[in-house]
Amino acid sequence: MLPIVVSILLATPLALCQAPFWMPNMQQFSFLTETDFRNALLLPTTNTRRVRSLYHDMRIPFQRFKRGGGVAVAAEKDKWPNGRVPYILSAAYTSAQRAVLARAFDTYAKRTCIRFVPKSPADKDYIVIQKLDGCYADFSRVGGRQQVSLADECIDYATIIHELMHVIGFIHEHQREDRDSYVSILYQNVIQGANTDFDKLSNLGLSYYGEHYDYSSIMHYEANEGSRNGKNTIEAKNSHFTAIMGKASDFSTSDLRRVNRAYKCSIFAF
């Protein structure tokens, strides 16, 4: 079933429409349409694994480190109220790409209480999804306009739901404070300048809602993510899990429990 917000969209196609007067910079932006959500239902459910490297894909404002608090997700004040995330979407995406985006939005709506909804004139905090320079997103609700970059190489279902997890406040699994009990980081193999993407985020005061470290999380890097020489940058303490890390094509059960607990999604069992 389509998210409730879809039914209130304009009946005319929006992919190439001029932005309403309240959209920033009068650029070409749009929203997903009912057609996009119908097309999403026609997409194959196989071969959805991400194909693009994701190191350096999360941006955390400096003040967030000083404030602390959070949930492996952000502090309460940095969450999106009632799980509602207003968005505007670049009109540069093709109909096929919009269908993949719609599938990601619809999955959040069906399996959590997170709703990505068209930005209204009253919404001051919102995300802008554009084709910029790779795949990345601002961490949690930062206030005002915030960026989600999904370039052409990022338009696969797994990458999109991963980046949207950053938007609602979730960090990478290998950056948990307790990660040293589960994985080893091989900094000697990490691309120069990317060490911070492998550091623990121990000063954010994160909580994990009772969920153990999850090698199958959609938020986990692959073993050779961000490698400068093709060798592993992350290895599981139990070598069996090294081949599993970063191979997720969808949310893990633990991912969904964390989202639903963090946002108090009472209609979902968690």
UniProtKB/Swiss-Prot annotation:
* One Pfam family this sequence matches: Astacin
Which Cys pairs does UniProt list as disulfide-bonded? C113-C265, C135-C154
What is its subcellular localisation? Secreted
Residues reported to bind Zn(2+): H162, H166, H172
**What InterPro entries has UniProt attached to this entry?**
Astacin-like_dom, MetalloPept_cat_dom_sf, Peptidase_M12A, Peptidase_Metallo
Q: Name one GO biological process term.
A: proteolysis
EC id: 3.4.24.-
Recite the UniProt keywords alphabetically. Disulfide bond, Hydrolase, Metal-binding, Metalloprotease, Protease, Secreted, Signal, Zinc, Zymogen
SUPFAM superfamilies noted in UniProt: Metalloproteases ('zincins'), catalytic domain
Main EC class the enzyme belongs to: hydrolase
Give the Gene3D superfamilies listed for this entry: Collagenase (Catalytic Domain)
Cite the active-site annotation: E163
Principal cellular location given in the protein's record: secreted
One GO cellular component term of this record is:
extracellular region
Q: Which residues form the Peptidase M12A domain?
A: 71-266
Signal sequence, renumbered to the chain: 1-17
What is the stated purpose of this protein?
A: Metalloprotease.
Question: Which PANTHER family does the UniProt record give?
Answer: DISCOIDIN, CUB, EGF, LAMININ , AND ZINC METALLOPROTEASE DOMAIN CONTAINING, ZINC METALLOPROTEINASE NAS-1
State what protein this is by name: Zinc metalloproteinase nas-1
| Lineage, top ranks | Eukaryota, Metazoa, Ecdysozoa, Nematoda, Chromadorea
